[in-house]
Amino acid sequence: MRPWEVAVSRRPTTAPLNQRRLVGEPCITPLHLRRSPPVRHQWGQRDRPALHTSLHQDENFHHAVFSQHQQVPLDESRQYSHSGAAPRMLHTANQPPQQSSIMVDLHEQMHQGSVPISYTVTTVTTHGFPIHTGQPIPACNAQQLPACSVMFSGQLSLLCCLPPPLIQACTMQHLPVSYQAFPPLISSEHFILHPSPAVAPHQPPPHPPHPPPPHLPPINQFVPIQPQHPRMPLQRVENEVDLRGDQHPLGTFSYPPAHHPPALTPSVPLQYLPQETLHQELPYPVPYPHMLPRRITGQRYRLQQPLPPPPPPPPYYPGFLPYFLSMLPVPPTAVGPAISLDLDVDDVEMENYEALLNLAERLGEAKPRGLTKADIEQLPSYRFNLENHQSEQTLCVVCFSDFESRQLLRVLPCNHEFHAKCVDKWLKTNRTCPICRADASEVHRDVE
């Protein structure tokens, strides 16, 4: 008899015999009154006689369950009480006899470094049983058992749908897991085993298998669960959470009649995903996007980085604007009061100079072009004679030729002399003297 079988059939010795209920008996307590108190049993020397007395009561029940196990030495109970640490037992809420939930609290103390972790899941319908993580146990048949997934409280955990008649021994095949690689097992967190309804091996299933509901993932998939509340011991949230196997079905697992899978098949290894990697990348496409809305929304906002600030405007060069304006032609309507610009003095002077030049050009075009032929002939003229010439001017400024004798010279009112042909041609287009720029017509009026 193994220690966990003894722990399953263990009852308090102080209860009367008429109030004790054997393992195989159905529970007659109403469903709304069923609740398992968070009591943890301590293993000691004073409890061992009671364990042996209750062992004979459940011998027939456990003999059928563990008939296919290999014999384990009797000193196995000593190995389960190593280091002076007592295994802890948790009780689940009472379920109907045909479908019960088993909650297991893993041992807190483990060896440092890489140790082989293997634990046994047995077919019991009682309140609870202890599980240790230091005893290697033979492997189970993977085809006889459906795949298990892990769902810890607040993190990833083990969620196992197992028909009770089909479970003989479910162990992990000596998985070497280090302390850092599996923190939920070492931090004494809880995982829940939900067995599915029992199906006889030679009877057809009660109803055809149906796909899992849309809000739950199918079997053989690992589902990351996002914690919504801080983690706390299971005893504190027992009044708020009702863990029932019939409220959390994950699908129907059945076998065809008169068909048994092979006996020895390697078990499917379980995978553990740390909490920090669940929200970064998933090992499978997410078919249920509503399960992680808050984290995905947070990543979406984190990926949107703020836009860079716009580039600053180009600097203002005060000397460029007047130069550009001076290159443009000034229209006639632009003549008027000067536009006051807050510029340098040199720029203002240059702008005024350009404006004056433009104004002079416009005024010059507006005045009369030249003298008439009658006005030109009224100017005095004479023949040049070198002997009686009294003026110091001996050169015509228009043609740059010296005066010769017997040439006709014309004298302007400013007393400047020119060749008659040269100055007449100039006066037809201009009204001023070519040397002093004096007005020839005004001087002519004064002489008259």
Curated annotation (Swiss-Prot):
Give the species this sequence originates from.
Answer: Danio rerio (Zebrafish)
Ranges annotated as RING-type zinc finger: 396-437
Q: Which InterPro entries match?
A: Znf_RING (IPR001841), Znf_RING/FYVE/PHD (IPR013083)
Q: What positions belong to coiled-coil segments?
A: none
PROSITE patterns named in the record: ZF_RING_2
CDD domains documented for this protein: RING-H2_RNF44 (cd16680)
Q: Which PANTHER family match?
A: GH10160P, RING FINGER PROTEIN 44
**UniProt-recorded name of the protein:** RING finger protein 44
Keyword check for RNA-binding, yes or no.
Answer: no
**Sorted alphabetically, which keywords does the UniProt record give?**
Metal-binding, Zinc, Zinc-finger
MF terms from GO for this chain are:
ubiquitin protein ligase activity; zinc ion binding
Single GO biological process annotation from the record? protein ubiquitination
Write down the Pfam families for this protein, in alphabetical order: zf-RING_2
